[in-house]
Amino acid sequence: MTMNIGVIGCGLMGADHIRTLTTAVSGARVAAVNDADEGRAAGAAAEAEGARVHSDPFGLIDDAEVDAVVVASADETHEEFALACVRAGKPVLCEKPLATTSEACLRVVEAEMRGGRPLVQVGFMRRFDPSYLEMKRVLDSGRIGRALMLHSVHRNAGYPPALPDSALITGTGVHDIDIARWLLGQEIVTATAHTPRRSGLARPDFQDTRFLVLETENGVLVDVEIFVNAGYGYDVRGELVGELGSISLHPPATLTTRYEGLEGRPVARDFRPRFQDAYRNELQAWVTAGASGEVRGATAWDGYASAAVAEACLHSVATGSTAPVEIAPQPALYAPLAA
C-alpha cells in the first residue's frame, strides 16, 4: 500500500524531504505540495513526478487524496498546520520546533488527547542516526554502567543573518536537548546557560556562542557547547560517560587523504551530509508507522518537553541563574521515556 503524502514548505528542508521520499523511501508517494513561493512549489512538484500544487496549505491538508502530511514551512506556522492535521485525523511529520512556545506545543498535545491517539511526529532526526542509535544500544546494554555525564558539541559553519540569537537554543541546541532526553531516558529538571566570549565573526547584536548545563531527574549532568560561526564546517560530536566506561560519538567515516606531508579528511558544510541517513531512516519509519497508525519517533509530547527545557535555558540567559524546567504532568497517551 502506498501512502500519498502532502508536503507544506518546499524550501531547504521541504525540498530535501521531497527528494528523499521520491527516491529513497518505500511505500511513499509525494502527491501534493504547497509553498508560499508558487514558483518554488511548481519546481518541487516537478521533482516529485507530477505532484499537484496546492495554493492553500489547509486545502492540501483536507485533500481526500492526501493520506499524511510533512510540515517543513516557517517555524511560526507549525502549530496551526499540526493542529489542522490532527483535526483531519492525518499523520503529520512536523519539522522542529513543533511550535514557537511550550504553551503552543501543549495545545497540540491537548488536541491529540481529545482525538484519543498520537498523530504527530516531530522532526528530531538524531533519534534515527546510526551512531546515536548505537550509543543508546550500548548504554541500554549496561556495558558501561549507569550514565553519569553527557558531553555534546554542536557547531555550524554559519547561521542565517535574520535569526535572533535565541535561536541558538530554540533552533540549534534543542536537538541536543531532545537527544539527551532520549538517550538517557530521563527528563531534564534544571538548566543553566553560560555566555562564552563571542566570536569576531558575529554581528554586533548576535551572540554566536552558548554553553548549557542541564541536570536530569536522576542527577546526570549534560553539557552542550553551541557555536554557529565555526567557519571550518558542520561538526556534531559527543561523549557519554558511564560508571564503567564511555562512548564517544564522532563524525561518520569519510575518505582520508595524505598529500605533501599532510593527512586530512573533509568536513561537512552543513547538517545534510552528516545526517542524510538519519533523515532517510526518519522518513521511512514515519511512513511505515503511519500505515499502521503508530508514531515511532519523537511525539508531540517530546516536542513540548524539549521546548520547555529550551525556555528554561532562555530564562537562565536572561537572569544569569539556574532555572527550573516547568513541565506539565505527562498524559497516559504518550509512552514514558525508556531509561
Curated annotation (Swiss-Prot):
UniProt record similarity statement: Belongs to the Gfo/Idh/MocA family.
Q: Which organism is it from?
A: Saccharopolyspora erythraea (strain ATCC 11635 / DSM 40517 / JCM 4748 / NBRC 13426 / NCIMB 8594 / NRRL 2338)
Catalytic activity, reaction form: myo-inositol + NAD(+) = scyllo-inosose + NADH + H(+)
- The coding gene here is iolG2
The record's section on Gene3D superfamilies has:
Dihydrodipicolinate Reductase, domain 2, NAD(P)-binding Rossmann-like Domain
Q: How does it assemble?
A: Homotetramer.
- Tell me, what is an example of a GO biological process annotation in this record? inositol catabolic process
Q: What does this protein do?
A: Involved in the oxidation of myo-inositol (MI) to 2-keto-myo-inositol (2KMI or 2-inosose).
Q: What is this protein called?
A: Inositol 2-dehydrogenase 2
Q: What is its EC number?
A: 1.1.1.18
Task: Show the Pfam families listed in the entry.
Answer: GFO_IDH_MocA, GFO_IDH_MocA_C
User: What does the UniProt keyword field contain?
Assistant: NAD, Oxidoreductase
